[in-house]
């Protein structure tokens, strides 16, 4: 049986640092008009995205929680399964402790002021702002991934530690809200180079055909 595995479908999660460092944020969207449609194209300038800077080596973690409930009959058999909840969250650790845009996400829009080299942050009970956020990922072998949340809000921030042996960082968990029934978009541009395919599949067949043609050419040369 032919080996139909395809390395074009194998992706890594490295950041595309050429795309604003790999992560950008902007105002939350209210409709899908300006949603991205191509992992290789820049976001619409109308989204007003700016760089969010360095993130930790843990990258970005997506969690999809789909809670269900089994409805059973008198005999204890499952009759139907209902869905009671669905949520999408993102977790990322920001490493730029003085990045104003990041601080506004985790402390509040009106609680951060930047004047020259001075950044002032106030912690209070203000509701945190909603933002759109994009992650640009280099999938390897020329492939690209764009993960885009049109409306996300930070719901939890980890402890901030000030020590000599580490940088000041903010671990943020964000809830993704639906915009036109879309909470999160993942766009994938696969590698175009057929050389990354596994040996023995369709490419293997092509190689065998090429080998047969080469053999025929050699035989013809010997006959001449």
Kindly give the residue locations of the regions a language model identified.
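Oligomerization/assembly interface segments of phage tail-like spikes and tubes
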Residues: 80-100, 165-180
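Beta-strand-rich interaction surfaces with strong enrichment in secreted/lumenal proteins
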Residues: 77-80, 135-137, 160-162
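Polar/acidic, low-complexity leader/linker segments enriched in S/T/G and N/D
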Residues: 1-51, 203, 213, 218-220
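Short acidic, glycine/tyrosine-flanked loop/strand segments centered on an H-E-D-like triad
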Residues: 61-63, 69, 94-96, 145-158
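Short helix-loop boundary/capping segments
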Residues: 99-150
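N-terminal short leaders/motifs
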Residues: 21-48, 79-91, 116-130
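Mixed-charge, glycine-accented linear interaction segment located at domain edges/termini
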Residues: 143-224
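A glycine-rich, hydrophobic loop/mini-helix early in the fold
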Residues: 42-87
